[in-house]
């Protein structure tokens, strides 16, 4: 079987994944696949820190603005979309470069995860009971989902209740698909530095027009969209209703983002066999390029 060589970059929110991905894409003739459950939707730009055309700098990106805001996309759907993109990029003689902050989604794409369609059967259960069940029986899944996103919690519960081979039940879930030969990069930095970056990013989102972005989406599609349950968007709903202040909203998004970053790092340490790099290093780019060359020589 011909191996597909690829690069994958993971890291917590605001650590600096985008900048590195662009440099590596230019160096190794890559096209980038975004492994992000929100950036795949049109119009969800500012709150998801979606890469801008200027930041892309001519590098082709996939699974950005792929779906309409009112579409639904489970991890089962995302896995197929991403794997199809990998095959397409490879068939054209380029190297796929995957980038994302959610280890569960990255592992679902690269590893031997098998999912059945969630629509086959759904269970009516209280969110808190679903959380408790996942915590007691599927702790890895519990630790990697946004517990404040009720849709994600229920989806995770349905996956395991449908007796799928999921993150904690698939015997081969920790092994890379035989067809892939990835170089997995895990970016991190000192906690205080990371948290400061997160706080500044949230403030910048408001300056860039997050409020108007969310207003426009709600006016056109309502409040029941899947992506509105994500950090950076769900906190905006009570703010737009007038229930909380702007300052309280900024604080809530920042706090939720920091907590999520902590869970992301826990997942990367426990469930991903990658090479770790500190983004504060002045030699980061050269170090990564050298290591990739050694991997694929």
Q: Residues of each region from the PLM?
A:
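Phosphate/pyrophosphate-binding catalytic cores of soluble transferases and nucleic-acid-acting enzymes
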Residues: 1-297
